[in-house]
């Protein structure tokens, strides 16, 4: 879509001007300098709870969905300060922290070991972009 079409959808086009700072929600990696992205609103928490939320996400042009192995944390998470939020089965927040991305894997492991935790969301702690959803691997 052209810029007017994007604006009608509350979205804007951006060109990455640094190697970090443009995390693609689809490919789960940072855009390279010069890559085109869309910055769009995304209902990352569509649950019928007080925590229902929409926030900004970047999507790289031509991005392919990432496929991660069980217990893997996207590499772009390790490179930033992250806000982590754990939710229960009623989609209510029960735990939250801000931490360096290299600590996220251990935090998720401890949270998801608790049967009362249903899933977690990761956000960029500085700019608030939604990074990804974390849940238990299907068996």
Task: Give, region by region, the residue ranges found by the protein language model.
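Short solvent-exposed loop/turn micro-motifs enriched in small/polar/acidic residues
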Residues: 22, 77, 113-115
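Short, solvent-exposed amphipathic alpha-helical segments in soluble enzyme
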Residues: 54, 75, 136-139
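An N-terminal amphipathic alpha-helical segment
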Residues: 57-95
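Short, hydrophobic/π-rich interface segment
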Residues: 83-119, 123, 136-138
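Short Gly/Ser/Thr- and Asp/Glu-enriched loop/turn motifs at secondary-structure junctions
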Residues: 124-129
